[in-house]
């Protein structure tokens, strides 16, 4: 989940951390909020006797501004594809050379098809940059990836059928005549992402709104009028998915990974509600989970209906992205930066006799997709009791006995049964909403600052 943190607080944290790093190597890492399993930071610090100072940003544009300003010289940064293009084009990145330091994690990873497609597009967009037979791939390492989708309530009569009609894929955000009366619609509070969605709406209407080209002021005015006419019920970030879960909103545009976190959590809680209400026995819980995670899924018994209450639709031409680990060309600790990237994309690494699985752990922790096939397969394998034979997990009396014992001293969410069902739900969700083979969506365009300002002005005026 990509979250915000006060700039003043961040400055204080960085200053405090740097002052405490005397005598040890330090690495400055610019990242999104809650976008890493922080136990891995500690493990890396222990392995290399160093300190990692993590600063946070909530947009690619902020990343660019921070790095460009040079007030803080970051070693490793985590920008998305289109911002990597911009940094690469402006000579802000260091070529990544794992061979120089004997690091092999990236060589051992195979990319999934959607990330291969994203990198092909990044190569295409930067093919005019002369780097002496080098490409953007030499300056960037995939970290996490995903798409944007439209989260919606399944409790509003008629809404799901409307959304799943591909002809309505973008109009349900911008044309209230396509949704049931009273539908509450939210737009993500990011002008560049809202701009993309609006352009796709106009393209569906047969107009030329190419998302890779700067539009004339007349078309920006059309976008402004469109947004003003919709009168979104909310502009938000994390609050959108929370409000849809709570029933305060019905539709919202967001990162698929942000949706997935709540989906897995609610699916698990729904299954355990059926169990604790005596509407499902221990050996029926996996079946309950399978039923409620189907399209239009419900589990009906004893006159009761159990469902998750919300779902996600991902348009074929949605936003796709890959967030990447890159090294600033101003990095003061280039070797440590290489080791950090190698560590975070490793399948397995041992620190003080403890085995860590960084690439898997980061994916599991944040619920965004992995660029790496081996990690994706490991997530899918969570539903198997034996991944080699593909024998599906079953729950038995032994699981029930353990649950009854654990619940005496802890909450349901801290039990082994909860974790087991959550893992199974995660496997289902990744298979349903992320696909390792099918390419869906387009990356954003690396527009110049002047045009980004025009987009921001357009949306500020529309919301005024």
Indicate where each model-derived feature is located:
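C-terminal motif of bacterial Sec signal peptides marking the signal peptidase cleavage site
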Residues: 17-20
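Hinge/lid segment of periplasmic solute-binding proteins
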Residues: 60-64, 81, 85-145, 161-172, ...
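Short loop->beta-strand "edge-of-pocket" segments that line small-molecule binding or catalytic clefts
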Residues: 171-191
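Mature extracytoplasmic/periplasmic domains
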Residues: 323-438
């Amino acid at each position: 989940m990509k979250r915000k943190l006060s700039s003043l607080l961040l400055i204080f944290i960085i200053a405090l951390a740097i002052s405490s790093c005397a005598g040890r190597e330090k690495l400055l890492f610019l990242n999104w909020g809650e976008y890493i399993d922080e136990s891995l930071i500690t493990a890396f610090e222990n392995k290399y006797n160093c300190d990692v100072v993590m600063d946070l940003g909530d947009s690619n544009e902020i990343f660019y501004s921070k790095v460009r300003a040079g007030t803080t010289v970051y070693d490793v940064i985590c920008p998305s594809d289109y911002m990597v293009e911009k940094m690469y084009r402006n000579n802000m990145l260091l070529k990544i050379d794992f061979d120089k330091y004997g690091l092999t994690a990236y060589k051992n990873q195979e990319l999934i098809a959607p990330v291969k497609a994203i990198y092909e597009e990044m190569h295409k967009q930067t093919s005019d940059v002369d780097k002496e037979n080098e490409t953007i791939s030499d300056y960037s390492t995939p970290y996490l990836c995903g798409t944007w989708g439209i989260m919606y309530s399944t409790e509003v009569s008629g809404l799901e059928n409307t959304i799943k009609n591909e002809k309505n894929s973008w109009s349900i955000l911008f044309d209230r005549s396509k949704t049931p009366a009273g539908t509450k619609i939210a737009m993500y509070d990011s002008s560049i992402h809202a701009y993309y969605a609006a352009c796709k709406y106009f393209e569906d209407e047969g107009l030329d709104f190419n998302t890779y080209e700067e539009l004339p002021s007349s078309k920006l005015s059309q976008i402004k009028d469109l947004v003003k006419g919709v009168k979104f019920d909310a502009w938000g970030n994390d609050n959108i998915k929370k409000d849809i879960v709570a029933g305060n909103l019905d539709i919202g545009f967001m990162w698929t990974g942000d949706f997935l976190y709540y989906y897995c959590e609610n699916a698990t809680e729904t299954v355990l509600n059926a169990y604790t209400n005596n509407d499902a026995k221990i050996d029926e819980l996996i079946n309950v989970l399978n039923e409620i995670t189907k399209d239009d899924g419900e589990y009906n018994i004893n006159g009761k209906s159990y469902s998750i209450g919300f779902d996600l639709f991902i348009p074929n031409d949605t936003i796709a992205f890959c967030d990447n680990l890159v090294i600033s060309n101003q990095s003061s600790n280039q070797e440590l930066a290489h080791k950090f990237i190698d560590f975070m994309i490793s399948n397995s690494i041992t620190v003080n006799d403890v085995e860590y699985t960084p690439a898997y752990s980061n994916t599991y922790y944040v619920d965004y997709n992995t660029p790496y096939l081996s990690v994706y397969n490991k997530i899918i394998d969570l539903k198997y009791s034996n991944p080699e034979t593909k024998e599906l997990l079953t729950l038995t009396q032994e699981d029930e006995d353990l649950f009854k014992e654990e619940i005496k001293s802890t909450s349901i969410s801290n039990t082994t049964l909860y974790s087991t069902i959550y893992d199974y739900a995660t496997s289902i969700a990744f298979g349903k909403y992320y696909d390792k083979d099918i390419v869906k969506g387009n990356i954003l365009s690396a527009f110049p600052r002047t045009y980004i300002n025009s987009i921001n002005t357009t949306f500020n005026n529309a919301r005024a």
